């Protein structure tokens, strides 16, 4: 008896790194693929992953510098080749790696003449420097220079305020983004309904994380963002005959409408047009297409009526109420 082999497509998603290189101490590159994906899924994942890579991953930066010898951040100090502003800019570019929480202090204390590099920074145990050769300043005379530093771990970026200084300490623009760039592209294959996609993801980092580490952290952050949706306590709306209609998060629409009517019953709702409410364009167009032209028309509809409107969402109901209560 000969048994014929049957091919079964399990559609198990697989990802792998197809290219990895270190261009310098402060530039890593990685290229990854994820497949097989159904049509449209690659773009969904690619956009979300790129945003998570660029905005959700924490990094470590020097955020403040302090020295008794610095009168202001655009001054020059005798015996130092660079201006104070240039020194602060150089400190801004120092790439650090850490697992710290909150802020830590660091110190530079050197005697000239000579070059000051990242190697001269005395760091707390939880912080390390990626490139010890990064230049900070040049001392041209035998002077002592001590600079106190504040180190923070955060995400995104923090821009210094022009007058944000304390006792001769100066804020430094901080970019807490270990991922310098991320791109995604899509390759489609197959025919008709069997069409599938491969997602290509390219990641460049500053060396404080490898692209693979960045991909893992971005993935974890995305998962954590979506976990709450798995545990939402749903409340069920019922019609008057108790037949099940729809399951949605409950907004106290009716009670808020009653309060609105009590507060504004002296006003003629039929003379207030929705054009006057400054609604977002999409909500305005949805209401107009449903022949809702005045505030009276709007308030005569229940929450259930409104969410039946094409392209109208439960969040739009809350948005309308928020706008009305401010009027």
Swiss-Prot record:
BP-aspect Gene Ontology terms: DNA-templated transcription
Chain residue ranges for the region called Alpha N-terminal domain (alpha-NTD): 1-233
Location of region: Alpha C-terminal domain (alpha-CTD): 266-327
Record note on quaternary structure: In plastids the minimal PEP RNA polymerase catalytic core is composed of four subunits: alpha, beta, beta', and beta''. When a (nuclear-encoded) sigma factor is associated with the core the holoenzyme is formed, which can initiate transcription.
SUPFAM superfamilies, sorted: C-terminal domain of RNA polymerase alpha subunit, Insert subdomain of RNA polymerase alpha subunit, RBP11-like subunits of RNA polymerase
InterPro entries xref list: DNA-dir_RNA_pol_insert, DNA-dir_RNA_pol_RpoA/D/Rpb3, DNA-dir_RpoA, RBP11-like, RNAP_asu_C, RNApol_insert_sf
E.C. no: 2.7.7.6
Residues making up the signal peptide according to the UniProt record: none
Domain note: The N-terminal domain is essential for RNAP assembly and basal transcription, whereas the C-terminal domain is involved in interaction with transcriptional regulators and with upstream promoter elements.
Biological classification of the source: Eukaryota, Viridiplantae, Streptophyta, Embryophyta, Tracheophyta
Keyword set, alphabetical order: Chloroplast, DNA-directed RNA polymerase, Nucleotidyltransferase, Plastid, Transcription, Transferase
Main location group: plastid
Known function: DNA-dependent RNA polymerase catalyzes the transcription of DNA into RNA using the four ribonucleoside triphosphates as substrates.
Top-level taxon of origin: Eukaryota
Keyword Calcium: no
GO cellular component: chloroplast; DNA-directed RNA polymerase complex; mitochondrion
Family: Belongs to the RNA polymerase alpha chain family.
Entry protein name: DNA-directed RNA polymerase subunit alpha
GO molecular function: DNA binding; DNA-directed RNA polymerase activity; protein dimerization activity
Pfam families referenced in this protein's UniProt entry, alphabetically: RNA_pol_A_bac, RNA_pol_A_CTD, RNA_pol_L
Protein's cellular compartments: Plastid, Chloroplast
Catalytic activity: RNA(n) + a ribonucleoside 5'-triphosphate = RNA(n+1) + diphosphate
């Amino acid at each position: 008896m000969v048994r014929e082999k049957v091919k079964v497509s399990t559609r198990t998603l697989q990802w792998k790194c197809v290219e990895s290189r270190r261009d310098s101490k402060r530039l890593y590159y990685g290229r990854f693929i994820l497949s097989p994906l159904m049509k449209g899924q690659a773009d969904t994942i690619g956009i979300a992953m790129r945003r998570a890579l660029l905005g959700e991953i924490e990094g470590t930066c020097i955020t403040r510098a302090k020295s008794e010898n610095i009168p202001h951040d655009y001054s020059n100090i005798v015996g130092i080749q660079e201006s104070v502003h240039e020194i602060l800019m150089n400190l801004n570019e120092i790439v650090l790696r850490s697992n710290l929480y909150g802020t830590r202090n660091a110190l530079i204390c050197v005697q000239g003449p000579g070059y000051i590099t990242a190697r001269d920074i005395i760091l707390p145990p939880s912080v390390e420097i990626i490139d010890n050769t990064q230049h900070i300043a040049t001392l041209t005379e035998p002077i002592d220079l001590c600079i106190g530093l504040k180190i923070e771990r955060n995400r995104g970026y923090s821009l210094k305020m022009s007058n944000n200084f304390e006792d001769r300490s100066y804020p430094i623009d901080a970019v807490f983004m270990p991922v310098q760039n991320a791109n995604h592209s899509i390759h489609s294959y197959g025919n008709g309904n069997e069409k599938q996609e491969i997602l290509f993801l390219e990641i460049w980092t500053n060396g404080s994380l490898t692209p693979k580490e960045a991909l893992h952290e971005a993935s974890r952050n995305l998962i954590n963002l979506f976990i709450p949706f798995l545990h939402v306590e749903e409340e069920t709306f019922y019609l008057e005959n108790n037949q099940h209609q729809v399951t949605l998060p409950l907004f106290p629409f009716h009670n808020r409408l009653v309060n609105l009517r009590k507060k504004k019953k002296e006003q003629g709702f039929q003379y207030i047009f929705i054009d006057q409410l400054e609604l977002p364009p999409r909500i305005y167009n949805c209401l107009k297409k449903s022949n809702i032209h005045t505030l009276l028309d709007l308030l005569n509809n229940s929450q259930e009526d409104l969410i039946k409107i094409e392209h109208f969402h439960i969040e739009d109901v809350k948005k309308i109420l928020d706008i009305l209560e401010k009027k």
